[in-house]
Curated annotation (Swiss-Prot):
Top-rank taxon: Bacteria
Organism: Sorangium cellulosum (strain So ce56)
Region ranges (Disordered): 71-106
Bilayer topology: Peripheral membrane protein
Record protein name field: Putative membrane protein insertion efficiency factor
Amino acid composition bias (Basic and acidic residues), ranges on this chain: 88-98
Entry keyword set: Cell inner membrane, Cell membrane, Membrane
GO cellular component: plasma membrane
């Protein structure tokens, strides 16, 4: 509920004020993705509270003394129950490519499997 409201506010900013700023001053964002896209991705991936905190940290880095550049949102954390089902790193065999650690599904060990290709399943919002 709160995440939906925050995403609607971000989208409203992107459609109105952000476009006005770009029209008057040109593109001024020092980061890629922009802070509003970063905030939307963080809220989708991490929820309203953690996503808002990550977005606030990003906004605090937006000043003339920071070099900016590519700064992607952090990957989502695993839920504790999902993390408990996964083998710990020291117990896992790094040569075992028959199981996907993210879903636990049995996979053929060919190059097009989602585990080998690095599929993250993330959805990002675009301006």
């Amino acid at each position: 509920m709160l995440a939906t409201l925050l995403l609607a506010l971000i989208r409203a900013y992107q459609m109105t004020l952000s476009r006005l700023i770009v029209a008057l001053m040109g593109p001024v964002c020092r980061f890629e993705p922009s802070c509003s896209r970063y905030a939307a991705a963080c809220i989708v991936d991490h929820g309203a509270l953690r996503g808002s905190l990550l977005s606030l940290k990003r906004l605090c880095r937006c000043h003339p003394f920071h070099p900016g550049g590519f700064d992607p949102p952090p990957p989502p954390r695993l839920h504790r129950a999902a993390a408990a089902r996964m083998p710990r790193q020291r117990d896992a065999d790094p040569r075992d490519t028959t199981r996907c650690s993210s879903t636990g599904a049995e996979l053929a060990s060919h190059a097009s499997s989602p585990c080998r290709a690095g599929f993250s399943g993330r959805v990002t919002l675009m301006d």
